[in-house]
Amino acid sequence: MVAPGRMVTSSRRIGRVTNKTKLIIYRGSDKVDTSAAETVLWDQEAGGAGKDSNKHQHIGATGVESGELLEHHLQAALSSASLLHSSNKPSSPKSVKEAPAAALNYHIPTPDATGLVSDTVFSQLYQRTKYVEPYNFIRFSDTVEESSCGWGGLGYCMDDADERWLNDFNSKAEGSSGDVKSDKEQGRGMRVKGKDREKEKGDAPAPLVISEDMFEYIMGVFEKYTEENAPMLHTDLSLLPPFSAVENMFSTPISPAFLPSNEIPKELGDLKACARMARNVYPHWKSRREQRQGKSILPQLNYDETNDNDPYVCFRRRDIRATRKTRRTDNFSIEQFQKLQFELRSAHALADRVLTREREKKSLYEAEKELWEARWKFFETKRRWPSLGMTSDEEHKITGRPTIVPPIQIPSLSGQTPLTSGQSSSHMRKRTDKDREERAQRERYDAQRNAERSGILSGRSNAPDALKERLQALQQKTEEMLARKKEQDAHWDDSIDSPYQPLPPSNSVHAFRSLFVLDPCRAQCKDSETGNEILHPESFRIRRGRGGIVRLDRRTSIYSHRRGIQPTSPSEYPTWLFPDIAPRRSEKKRPRSIDEVEEEMQEQSPKAMRKDLNETWRYDVDRGGAVGVGMGLEEDYDRVIIDDLEAKYIRHRISLLQESDCAKLRPDNYILDQTREALDAAADAKPPPAPIFQKPPAPQPNPQLLAAHLQQQQMLAQQQQMEQFQRFQLMAQQQAMAQAQAQAQAQAQAQAQAQAQAQVQAQGQGHPQAHLQTHPQGVSQPNGVNSPMPNGQQMLPPSDGVKQLKLPPHAVARLGAAMANANANANGGLHVLQQQQQQHAQTSQQ
């Protein structure tokens, strides 16, 4: 251990202790000068003298860091201690009188570490025994808090107040259980009956004693439930949960997820007793909570480090713990542990499966042993009573070997092609040989079985006569019961014996008339050659076809043929199995002579008979032969014909009609009843209430305003027509003026050319120069620009007024025609506008 030392008061900096610092360890037997020891600080980081060096401050004379010397509680405790120390000093050195003991006004509660322990107390606390570390020292990795928790991991620990209440409760419970007074003390001199005495014993409840562990468990459940459901109880005590809300935690099995250990404690016992205990503990817990002002009964440590100035924070870190980085070696070790865990789990699963397999094998062997013993007992019973006999099933149960029974060979009916004579003979020979071998094998097996039975069951029968008489009596009684049952059911039809109910014949069958109705003597006739009876006589019906044509339909008679020997060819099986429905060829058409009938009967082969049979089944609608879409014999070839004798249709008809089936055949009056109810409801219905808010009526049109509006529209239309007419006139005038101006220019040019030619002819003999001087080509204008003179003549300036023009007669005529057309168009447009206005006025008035 590091030697305790005095507080260093020097101002020099003490070297911090790191993982590389060498320390001196003193033992109890060593003599150490405590005044020479120094107090050092542990440095978690070797390089902490850098940016965090200001946090590692020197420890002063008070034993705390210099940064915490100004803490309020520490200063108050130091001041109180200094006052106490000053008051204990004597007033003078020579005075012997002791000063009165003074108490600290404020102190920090710390355990008293002053003084030395006596040898007797030390020997009791620290015995001189050698510690031996066990081989299973490390068992689990739970923390101290987890290890010290109670049932279910709940961390409630009872204090002195809880202990006093629990002792009082248990003492009262034990005292109340022993206060049962006797009959003599109660003054009852009469004797009590046994039933009353038992009743009194049953009415006395068992004493309810609560153990400390059970008390801590109940209080822990109350605390955890309140912490989860009422975390703000310290602000409002009305949120305290009642006992009815917590009773289900004790009267019913508690959920493992509610407990911190996720395991239900095995020591709980009966739930009813647990609920009684919780009901008695609840008032005490409630009072403790109210005393704590809704806070937890056990004070909670403050681990919140957000506020550095809070002095009540427990286990504060002096230095910021550095974040440790994950290294490759750590990952490797983790991977190795994971691999080891996977291998151990695989080995455990494999061992578990092997154990399961061996258990199944054991159960299988036990079952086989029981089966063998049952067979042996059954065999002994048969051997002791040989009169009981032995069947093939019983022999199979005893020996375990099934009896080989050859299957019955039935020729296949799927073949349609008859075999030839050579193929048929070879097939019959092979089948005969095979049957002979199977018969010989079966005979040998029967002989061997009879020999074994005669060897095992040989000797005289040991069955007593009483057993035989009893068997005969049982057989006679059974026969009498069957006869009596038959007499009772004589007038009843058993639906189990005949479950099939044939369908009623169709209307087409009723329309056919048999020849027996016309000639009753033919009903007793038979076939003269074979003597076969007639099953279905020949019948006819008359029907009217399309176009009013009368048609006669007939059905030939069907005879009951005799069944001969079993055929050898598969093609002969349909005729041999169903002879009654295979009509002969002579029955399908009208014979012409007797010789023809005999020849047809002789020439008809089994193949032809099978073909006729297939055709009959295919097209016979009454027998269900025509099945599918488009197989009908009527005009509607697309109708679907089904087989009424098929299993999915016949299963609805094999039982008798019930009352519910008859109800389905009646008409449904639901729609009529519903309609009648609706009419009655409409007749009795009250008129709808008048609405509170009604829509205001539309305003009536004012005829004066309409007339004024119509007149204004007419005036606007007339004004638009006048403007359009004036526009047309102006356009016509402009066109006429342009034409007149063009004609005037053309005439002026023609006159100028004529005058120029005349002058040239008159003065043709003159000098050219004089001619040029006398008649210049251009006249100078005031602005200095010479005006052109076409053909030696100066052009006149254009006239701006219309009055200066004088139009020729043809231009005047053309202008008049254009103006007349414009007036006609304007008058026509005005007439159309007036008609539209009149129609609009009529529609608005309507």
Swiss-Prot record:
Compositionally biased tracts (Low complexity): 759-773
Residue ranges with Pro residues bias: 686-702
Residue ranges, compositional bias (Polar residues): 411-426, 774-796
Region (Disordered): 169-204, 391-466, 587-609, 682-702, 759-804
Entry's localization field: Nucleus
A single BP term in Gene Ontology: DNA repair
Keyword Coiled coil carried by entry: yes
A GO cellular component entry from the record: nucleus
Residue spans of biased composition, Basic and acidic residues class: 180-203, 432-452
Pfam families in the record: EPL1 (PF10513)
Keywords: Cell cycle, Coiled coil, DNA damage, DNA repair, Nucleus, Transcription, Transcription regulation
Coiled coil: 434-490
Keyword Endoplasmic reticulum among UniProt keywords: no
Function summary: Component of the NuA4 histone acetyltransferase complex which is involved in transcriptional activation of selected genes principally by acetylation of nucleosomal histone H4 and H2A. The NuA4 complex is also involved in DNA repair. Involved in gene silencing by neighboring heterochromatin, blockage of the silencing spreading along the chromosome, and required for cell cycle progression through G2/M.
Subunit and partners: Component of the NuA4 histone acetyltransferase complex.
Family: Belongs to the enhancer of polycomb family.
Name of the protein described by the UniProt record: Enhancer of polycomb-like protein 1
Organism: Cryptococcus neoformans var. neoformans serotype D (strain B-3501A)
Gene coding for it: EPL1
